[in-house]
Amino acid sequence: MVALLIRKESFEKEISNKKIISKKYLSREKALLEVYKHLPKKIPKISTTGMLSRELNEINTKNKTTDSTLMCVGGMGHAISIATGIAKFKRKKKILCLDGDGAALMHLGAQASSAKMKNLIHIVFNNFAHDSVNGRRPPTENISFYKLASELGYSKSFIVKNKKEIKNKIKFSLKSKKSVFIEIICTRGHRKNLTRPEKDTIYYKKKFMSFLKK
Protein backbone atom coordinates (compact mmCIF):
# COMPACT_ATOMS: atom_id res chain seq x y z
CA MET A 1 0.00 0.00 0.00
CA VAL A 2 1.26 3.49 -0.90
CA ALA A 3 0.07 6.74 0.68
CA LEU A 4 0.64 10.14 -0.91
CA LEU A 5 0.64 12.98 1.62
CA ILE A 6 -0.06 16.44 0.24
CA ARG A 7 0.14 19.79 1.99
CA LYS A 8 -3.05 21.76 2.52
CA GLU A 9 -3.90 24.16 -0.35
CA SER A 10 -1.79 22.11 -2.79
CA PHE A 11 -4.65 21.78 -5.27
CA GLU A 12 -5.60 24.62 -7.57
CA LYS A 13 -9.28 25.41 -7.91
CA GLU A 14 -10.99 23.43 -10.64
CA ILE A 15 -12.22 25.36 -13.65
CA SER A 16 -15.97 25.10 -14.14
CA ASN A 17 -17.18 22.64 -16.75
CA LYS A 18 -20.32 22.35 -18.85
CA LYS A 19 -22.04 20.09 -16.38
CA ILE A 20 -21.68 22.40 -13.39
CA ILE A 21 -25.20 23.04 -12.20
CA SER A 22 -26.64 26.53 -12.59
CA LYS A 23 -27.46 28.74 -9.63
CA LYS A 24 -31.17 28.08 -10.04
CA TYR A 25 -30.63 24.89 -8.03
CA LEU A 26 -30.15 24.75 -4.27
CA SER A 27 -26.73 24.69 -2.68
CA ARG A 28 -25.93 21.36 -1.02
CA GLU A 29 -26.28 22.98 2.39
CA LYS A 30 -29.74 24.35 1.62
CA ALA A 31 -30.80 21.03 0.11
CA LEU A 32 -29.51 19.24 3.21
CA LEU A 33 -31.39 21.62 5.49
CA GLU A 34 -34.57 21.00 3.49
CA VAL A 35 -34.11 17.25 3.92
CA TYR A 36 -33.51 17.71 7.66
CA LYS A 37 -36.67 19.80 8.10
CA HIS A 38 -38.85 16.87 7.07
CA LEU A 39 -37.13 14.16 9.09
CA PRO A 40 -38.12 12.80 12.49
CA LYS A 41 -35.50 13.93 15.01
CA LYS A 42 -34.76 10.37 16.11
CA ILE A 43 -33.97 8.88 12.70
CA PRO A 44 -30.39 7.49 12.59
CA LYS A 45 -28.29 9.32 9.99
CA ILE A 46 -25.02 8.14 8.46
CA SER A 47 -23.26 10.88 6.49
CA THR A 48 -20.38 10.74 4.05
CA THR A 49 -17.00 12.33 4.65
CA GLY A 50 -16.25 15.91 3.66
CA MET A 51 -18.27 19.10 3.55
CA LEU A 52 -21.65 17.40 3.77
CA SER A 53 -20.87 16.03 7.24
CA ARG A 54 -19.58 19.43 8.36
CA GLU A 55 -22.79 21.07 7.15
CA LEU A 56 -24.88 18.40 8.84
CA ASN A 57 -22.91 18.79 12.06
CA GLU A 58 -23.78 22.50 12.19
CA ILE A 59 -27.46 21.68 11.66
CA ASN A 60 -27.35 18.94 14.30
CA THR A 61 -25.55 21.17 16.80
CA LYS A 62 -28.10 23.93 16.36
CA ASN A 63 -31.00 21.49 16.82
CA LYS A 64 -29.35 19.32 19.50
CA THR A 65 -29.55 16.16 17.38
CA THR A 66 -25.82 15.38 17.16
CA ASP A 67 -26.24 11.97 18.81
CA SER A 68 -28.38 10.74 15.91
CA THR A 69 -25.58 11.03 13.34
CA LEU A 70 -22.51 9.01 12.49
CA MET A 71 -20.15 11.10 10.37
CA CYS A 72 -17.84 8.93 8.25
CA VAL A 73 -14.85 11.26 8.54
CA GLY A 74 -12.01 9.96 6.36
CA GLY A 75 -14.11 7.02 5.18
CA MET A 76 -15.10 8.15 1.71
CA GLY A 77 -17.53 5.78 0.04
CA HIS A 78 -18.20 3.71 3.16
CA ALA A 79 -21.27 5.52 4.52
CA ILE A 80 -23.71 3.37 2.56
CA SER A 81 -22.11 0.11 3.71
CA ILE A 82 -22.29 1.22 7.34
CA ALA A 83 -25.91 2.32 6.88
CA THR A 84 -26.70 -1.05 5.30
CA GLY A 85 -25.22 -2.92 8.25
CA ILE A 86 -27.23 -0.85 10.71
CA ALA A 87 -30.41 -1.29 8.66
CA LYS A 88 -29.92 -5.05 8.72
CA PHE A 89 -29.91 -5.21 12.51
CA LYS A 90 -32.37 -2.38 13.16
CA ARG A 91 -35.14 -3.47 10.84
CA LYS A 92 -37.88 -1.68 12.77
CA LYS A 93 -36.12 1.68 12.32
CA LYS A 94 -35.80 3.84 9.24
CA ILE A 95 -32.09 4.35 8.50
CA LEU A 96 -30.89 7.32 6.45
CA CYS A 97 -27.67 7.51 4.46
CA LEU A 98 -26.57 10.96 3.29
CA ASP A 99 -24.07 10.47 0.50
CA GLY A 100 -22.15 12.42 -2.13
CA ASP A 101 -21.78 11.73 -5.85
CA GLY A 102 -18.06 10.95 -5.69
CA ALA A 103 -18.44 8.81 -2.58
CA ALA A 104 -21.36 6.88 -4.06
CA LEU A 105 -19.34 6.18 -7.20
CA MET A 106 -16.31 5.01 -5.22
CA HIS A 107 -18.09 1.93 -3.84
CA LEU A 108 -21.01 1.70 -6.24
CA GLY A 109 -21.27 -2.07 -5.89
CA ALA A 110 -22.30 -1.69 -2.25
CA GLN A 111 -25.67 -0.45 -3.45
CA ALA A 112 -26.55 -3.92 -4.70
CA SER A 113 -26.71 -4.91 -1.02
CA SER A 114 -28.16 -1.68 0.35
CA ALA A 115 -31.02 -1.84 -2.15
CA LYS A 116 -32.30 -4.95 -0.37
CA MET A 117 -32.79 -3.12 2.93
CA LYS A 118 -36.49 -2.24 3.06
CA ASN A 119 -35.96 0.27 5.88
CA LEU A 120 -33.16 2.20 4.15
CA ILE A 121 -33.34 5.66 2.59
CA HIS A 122 -30.27 6.51 0.51
CA ILE A 123 -29.84 10.14 -0.56
CA VAL A 124 -27.05 11.23 -2.91
CA PHE A 125 -26.31 14.96 -3.15
CA ASN A 126 -24.99 15.36 -6.67
CA ASN A 127 -23.06 18.55 -7.40
CA PHE A 128 -20.63 16.93 -9.85
CA ALA A 129 -17.67 17.80 -7.63
CA HIS A 130 -15.43 16.75 -4.75
CA ASP A 131 -15.79 19.91 -2.67
CA SER A 132 -13.24 18.86 -0.07
CA VAL A 133 -10.46 18.91 -2.70
CA ASN A 134 -11.24 22.30 -4.25
CA GLY A 135 -14.14 21.07 -6.35
CA ARG A 136 -12.33 18.43 -8.38
CA ARG A 137 -14.71 16.66 -10.72
CA PRO A 138 -15.43 12.96 -10.30
CA PRO A 139 -16.16 11.11 -13.58
CA THR A 140 -19.92 11.40 -13.08
CA GLU A 141 -20.94 13.88 -15.76
CA ASN A 142 -22.92 11.34 -17.76
CA ILE A 143 -24.12 9.21 -14.86
CA SER A 144 -27.71 9.25 -13.63
CA PHE A 145 -27.43 7.90 -10.11
CA TYR A 146 -31.16 7.37 -9.69
CA LYS A 147 -31.24 5.21 -12.82
CA LEU A 148 -28.28 3.18 -11.59
CA ALA A 149 -30.01 2.76 -8.24
CA SER A 150 -33.05 1.33 -9.95
CA GLU A 151 -30.91 -1.14 -11.90
CA LEU A 152 -29.11 -2.13 -8.69
CA GLY A 153 -32.40 -3.04 -7.06
CA TYR A 154 -33.79 -0.08 -5.12
CA SER A 155 -37.57 -0.38 -4.99
CA LYS A 156 -38.06 3.30 -5.74
CA SER A 157 -35.56 5.83 -7.10
CA PHE A 158 -36.06 9.52 -7.78
CA ILE A 159 -34.23 12.62 -8.94
CA VAL A 160 -35.19 15.95 -7.35
CA LYS A 161 -34.13 19.53 -8.01
CA ASN A 162 -36.05 21.85 -5.67
CA LYS A 163 -37.50 22.20 -2.18
CA LYS A 164 -40.98 21.00 -3.09
CA GLU A 165 -39.66 17.84 -4.71
CA ILE A 166 -37.36 17.18 -1.76
CA LYS A 167 -40.25 17.55 0.69
CA ASN A 168 -42.52 15.23 -1.31
CA LYS A 169 -39.93 12.48 -1.74
CA ILE A 170 -38.77 12.58 1.89
CA LYS A 171 -42.37 12.19 3.04
CA PHE A 172 -42.84 9.32 0.59
CA SER A 173 -39.63 7.66 1.77
CA LEU A 174 -40.60 7.78 5.43
CA LYS A 175 -43.88 6.02 4.67
CA SER A 176 -42.43 3.49 2.23
CA LYS A 177 -42.09 -0.15 3.25
CA LYS A 178 -39.26 -0.67 0.77
CA SER A 179 -35.84 0.80 -0.06
CA VAL A 180 -35.80 4.30 -1.53
CA PHE A 181 -33.04 6.17 -3.38
CA ILE A 182 -33.10 9.93 -3.96
CA GLU A 183 -30.64 11.88 -6.11
CA ILE A 184 -30.63 15.60 -5.29
CA ILE A 185 -29.11 17.89 -7.90
CA CYS A 186 -27.38 20.83 -6.22
CA THR A 187 -24.71 23.44 -6.87
CA ARG A 188 -21.01 23.24 -6.09
CA GLY A 189 -19.26 25.03 -3.28
CA HIS A 190 -19.59 25.61 0.45
CA ARG A 191 -19.40 28.42 2.97
CA LYS A 192 -15.87 29.55 3.75
CA ASN A 193 -16.73 29.82 7.45
CA LEU A 194 -18.05 26.27 7.67
CA THR A 195 -16.98 24.86 11.03
CA ARG A 196 -15.56 21.45 11.89
CA PRO A 197 -16.89 19.09 14.58
CA GLU A 198 -15.55 20.10 18.01
CA LYS A 199 -14.94 16.56 19.31
CA ASP A 200 -12.95 13.66 17.89
CA THR A 201 -14.53 10.88 15.84
CA ILE A 202 -14.45 8.37 18.73
CA TYR A 203 -16.61 10.68 20.82
CA TYR A 204 -19.27 10.94 18.11
CA LYS A 205 -19.14 7.21 17.42
CA LYS A 206 -19.82 6.37 21.06
CA LYS A 207 -22.68 8.88 21.26
CA PHE A 208 -24.21 7.40 18.12
CA MET A 209 -23.88 3.83 19.41
CA SER A 210 -25.67 4.83 22.62
CA PHE A 211 -28.37 6.51 20.54
CA LEU A 212 -28.95 3.33 18.52
CA LYS A 213 -29.50 1.30 21.69
CA LYS A 214 -32.42 3.45 22.79
Segments predicted by a language model, with ranges:
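Active-site pocket-lining segments that scaffold enzyme catalytic pockets across diverse folds
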Residues: 8, 15-48
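Acidic-glycine-rich active-site phosphate/pyrophosphate-binding loop
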Residues: 44-65
